[in-house]
Each structure stands twice: as structure tokens, then as C-alpha cells.
Amino acid sequence: MKGRKLLMIPGPIEFEPNVLQALGSATTSHVDPNFIEVFGKSLELMREVWRSPKGQPFIVSGTGTLAMDMAAANLIEEGDSVLVISTGYFGKRFKDIADRYGANTTILEAPLGEVISLQRIEKELKTKHYKALTITHVDTSTGILADPKPIAKLAQKYNTLSILDGVCSVAGEEIKQDQWGLDVVLTGSQKAIGVPPGLALLMVSKTAMEVWRNRKTPVFNYYSDWNNWLPIMRAYEERKPAYFGTPPVNLIVALETSLKIICKEGMRERVKRHQILAKAFRAGISSLKLETIPKTNKIAANTLTAAYYPEGIDGATLLTKIANNNVIIAGGLLPELKTSYFRIGHMGSVSVNDLIAVLGALERALLELGHNIVPGKSLETFQNELLTSKQSKNEKRGSKEMNNIYDNNRFVNVD
């Protein structure tokens, strides 16, 4: 009998053994020379993962929501106009946060399963000057993938800051912060970054830092104020001790370990691995006669899949049966559709074998509940899609990404 269940929700995810080992190491002082080196190295590695050699990184004890709050607290003042581009629950959350800081907020909400067109965004940007716009790269509630690159270009065109909520995308989806002109890219530690919950991570452009420095009013939120955190980040990068609030020492040791694993794999290869696995997994889901929330594969996230329950199948019963097969997936999050769909995470060190286990558990549960499908169909479809991808890659230029997806990356050692 298996002693634990495979955690396949959209965060927290399954973590590398090396990361968990680092988390369990003896806690040192936050001004110990060894820890100062770890913190400084983590800040440097963030620039590599974010593709932002010019950015200012922040590592703060907190959640992804704190990272969102920090961006708003430091860049938005009362009366500023903010445009929120929403594809689900977390777009609306950014509106709530901006409203708390006195912003005049306009929200563009995409129809369920769709994204906002660039034409609609530009039309709104023409109506008045927006100080900032927010983009949810992957909305964890819907599995919708937005394309931040052209939106960031529009923001630059209209002298507007661009803030990317990358909570469910950083280290899983393609992001080139400096090249694309994104001003803030933020995330939490527990998703594709691959570290247990507890760290808010941000990368801030020189432009955004200058806007912050030229604020007319003090930052209202004491804990989120970059005035308190910037000297700490700079000190650690210079390998000097510093203190504002005690950092979560073990989490940061785990973060350095995970960032090294990510950088060893390589961002290009890591993103491609996520894309290949997600495409095959969606094909497997489709073969089970399940409809995903994203209406096209082009806007479907590569870090999670959101799909509707089949007609006549009780969601709670299905999730329980899957859990009895030692796999944990998540229910819905959108309040108006919470009981109508489920979500499966496939990010970080996820492997082929993980997704085979998920499809097998899902397929068995559906069959037990009377869903009319062919036994083994999802596994066959998934495997065939992977083999097709591998053959295509081999023919083009080699198969490094394909080798990565077949490795169980949770057993990779990094010096």
C-alpha cells in the first residue's frame, strides 16, 4: 500500500528531494556568511530564470498574493488609473488590490475560456493615461494562458507600466522580461519555481524602480514598502549582512537549490518540456470526452489543465475516487462554476510517469461512474502524442527536451 498520494494540484506541487532536503537542513543565522552567500546567489539566479539581467529581484517572506500587493503598494498611488486585464479569478483579485490603494481601476474581463483581444486593450488605453496595467499570465482558476509580449509592447507605447502576475507561469511558461519590456514579473515559490509555500518573488525593471522613487506620497503598506526591502536585497547581493525582518532561512536555502536545478535544465529546455507534456496531456484529456475551459489550445496553459466534469457525474464523488487511487487533483475555483470543473497541475519537475498516473486514476474513476469511454484510450493517446513529438524533435535537431520529459526530474542531483 502506498504511503503517500501524488499531489497534482496547481500548487503546491511535488517538490524535488534535493529541495526538501535543503528545507530540512539545520537553520542558521540570517547573517551567517554561508546563508548570506545562499541569499545573494538566489537573487542572481532569479535574473537568469526571469531572463532579466537588468532587473531588481526581491525575495520576501509571503505568498504570491503578497507579491501582487507589493507591486501595487509601491507603484500605485491614490487617484492613479490602472487597467486590469482579467481572464479569471486572479485578475479580479488584482482589481481588488489596486482598489485598496485608491486606484481608479478599469477591468477588462474576457468571456469564459477566452482572452482579451489586443484591439480591445489598445482601445481602452487610448481613452486616458493609465499608470499601470496588470496581466495574469496564467490564471490558475481557468487554465487560460495570456500572451504578455504584445501587451507589454502596447503598455510601452502608451507610457504605461506593465505588471505580470506570473504566479502560475514563472519557470514553466516562456518569459523574457527585459526583452519584452515587462516592468514587474511576480510569483510565489510553490508552483513552477518548485519550493514549498512561503516566498513572494518579484523582478522589477529600472523603469518601475524609477517610478517608485518618484512617488508623491509614502508607500502606505509598511511591510510591502521597497524602501525597507531594497537595502536588504542589495546587501545580500554584495554578500553583506543586513536586517529588516528575519528571512525564512530554510525556504531560501531550498529556493537556491531549486533555482540551480532550473538553471541546470535550462530555461529554453524547461519551457519546451512543459509545452510537450501539456500538449500530450490535453490530448489525453480530450480522448476521455472531457471539455477544457480554454476554447483553443493556443490559449491553454502549459502548467495546468482545467476541464469540465462530464454531464451526470458528481464532481465531489469523482475527486474522491481519484484520491482513492492515490492522486490528488483540485476542484474548481471560479465561484460561479466551482462545482462544474476540476484542475490538474503539471508544472515544475513533473514527469511523464506522473501524468500517466493521473490519467490512469482519472480514467478508472470515470469508468466506475459510468462515463462512456474506451478503457486505456487516454493513456494510448498520451503516449502516441509523446512519441510523435519525440520523432519530430529527433528529425529536426536532437531530443534534449524529450529526454528531459522521460527523466523523473525529482531525482536529479545538483551540486
What residue ranges belong to the model's regions?
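A glycine-/small-polar-enriched, mobile loop at the entrance of the PLP active site in fold-type I
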Residues: 4-61, 65
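Conserved active-site segment immediately N-terminal to the catalytic lysine
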Residues: 178-190
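Active-site C-terminal subdomain of aminotransferase-like
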Residues: 14-15, 190-283, 287
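Active-site phosphate-binding strand-loop segment of PLP-dependent enzymes
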Residues: 115-171, 184, 192
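Conserved PLP-binding catalytic core of the aspartate aminotransferase-like
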Residues: 291-322
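Conserved beta-loop-alpha segment that forms the PLP phosphate-binding cup at the N-terminus of a helix
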Residues: 55-83, 87, 91-95
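PLP-dependent enzyme catalytic core of the Aspartate aminotransferase-like
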Residues: 2, 336, 340-415
